[in-house]
Amino acid sequence: MKKVLFVGESWHVHVTESKGFDTFSFDYYEQATEYIQAALEAAGVEFHHIPSHLVEERFPTTAEGLAEYDMVLFSDVGANTMNLPMNVFQRLIPTVNKLELVREYVRKGGAFVMIGGYLTFQGIQGCGCYKRTAIEDILPVTLLEGDDRVECSQGLTPVVIDSVHPVMAGLPEQWPAVLGYNRLLPKEGSSVVARIGD
């Protein structure tokens, strides 16, 4: 059975409500993994999830640990979450570069997928921060500077360009509309199998 390591798609929300003179705050946690988990498990894939706030303690820090998985997926998790653990950020202690570890994993035959979102590719206000990282090296696209999001509240439907490409096996030719995407440029030699927007 294939094993997939899915990283991200989780968040904590802090809310402050003001009601006249009075205010109060509350927090809650959410994650959005149910659809992709169900799809992968239906295809016979063993699904392992690391929420964003647990990357520091759970993401593999060795090539051997990462090699236990057939594929690594990043979804809405920023480069800072991957590469600024507390030992680096607060204590100035060098540690493993997780993004370089993923690049080496791919160079040795591992599969990597980045799913678009507010904190992947460059994301909202450029906060995804993957430009000029080891991850950009292994992606088949070039990342833009700054905020790469295109919000389309009217919905846009991706157009399949190469339906016979192996990655498209089992996928319908007509896709549902999306409400936003990350604008990216294909690298020379990359196969473009679908396109959206300009």
Residue ranges and their predicted role:
Residues K3-V7, W11, E64-Q125:
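Short alpha-beta junction capping motif
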Residues V7, I50-H53, R195:
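Conserved beta-strand termini and adjacent loop/short-helix elements that scaffold enzyme active sites
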Residues H12-S18, A111-G197:
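An acidic, glycine-rich "communication" segment
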Residues H14-T33:
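Glycine- and acidic-residue-enriched helix-capping/strand-helix junction motifs
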Residues E41-E64:
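A short, well-structured beta->alpha microelement
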